[in-house]
Amino acid sequence: EAVKTLEAEGIVEVLNGKGIYVGNRSRGSNAIESLIGFTREREALIEALEARRAMETELIAMVVRNATDQEMAELGEITEVLMKKVRVGEPDTEEDKQFHEKIYQMCHNSVYYAVLKVLDEYTDKLWQFPLDIEDPFKASMPYHETLYEALKERDIKKAQKINHKLLDCVYEDIAIAHR
């Protein structure tokens, strides 16, 4: 999948039976195209984050009102595995996705869930190559545990505030990448 993406960008060329070679784009156009692509990617991520912040503010309130104790326990199990991986530096992408997916489900609103899933799929595409950030969005990971605790306490304002901090960390990574 990664090679296909690089091939589509003209960065590599795949020759059947011969291997993978550096693409044929000229240096000048490559630099300009990279700069334009970087700017568009950054702007798209910022816009997606703005939409996510607005939607998740209400999502948090719905989760606090609608989630069952069983769902909270399941989110707790996901959070525990996620945080263990974060603490030892293991890859945590799958657990991070499970965490957010579970929260989306816990709102018990199928339309809201569907809209959030579309936004989630869009940001996943953008984050395939996240602005050349090494270890992107790691600063946001500790907030997952405190967000879970606030949700479990059913404290809407506290959970919303923590979720905003989580998204602020992601935004900061994107802003730093642009400097």
Map each language-model feature to its residues.
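Short linear motifs at protein or domain termini
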Residues: 1-54, 61, 65
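Conserved amphipathic alpha-helical segments that form helical-bundle/coiled-coil interaction surfaces
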Residues: 48-129, 139-144, 158-173, 177
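Structural signature of alpha-solenoid helical repeat scaffolds
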Residues: 132-135
